[in-house]
Amino acid sequence: MFEFLRFYTFYLALLSGIIGLISMHKLPTNRAKFLVIIIWFAVVIEKVGYYFTEWTGLLNYYVFNFYMLITFSAYILLLRSLLSKVNHRLIAILCLMLFIISFFLNILYFKEDVNHSFTYSFAIGVILIMILACLYLVEIFNSDKILNFKRSVFFWYILGILVFHVPFLPFMMALNWFLIKHDESIFSLVVFILNVLAHSCYITGFLWSEKKYNY
């Protein structure tokens, strides 16, 4: 019934990407512009993933595992750049190393056929991003940035990452462990709703943020 919704996530990413481009004048640094690049990368991956099976006859796990490796690494590096305390930045580097190691361990686990969903790498990545996001929020709330944090595109971007991945993680793990029945209609509905929430945060950040808080 809702299977078609999953394919509309492409248009959500496209909308966010377009608004990001329109808002480039408010993104003064390479770090801020990097947010738009990540979104456009998602647009490309959504389209490639859609046609991958048609082109190759294979399931598109290859595409989305590659997407996970790049985007999660990018999220961790973004959070590292936003952290001001040296020990927190060191934790971010350790998180990046741990995630990359987990990803390649997943490849070794599926060495006979790596065209599977790397569920455990996804879970580890989400947990690491949650830890770093908490450190980022703690630093904000313990500094003068608390006065204008809603005007920062970075706050809204990190919030968007969290509102998608934190609820999706237990849902994905429940499917993987067969705690709930895999229903393509429900899966597509959940993915679509979480994408709406995430891209709403991204768009809010682009439109509501102010240039002076986006350095």
For each feature predicted by the language model, list its residue ranges.
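Terminal, non-globular segments
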Residues: 1-215
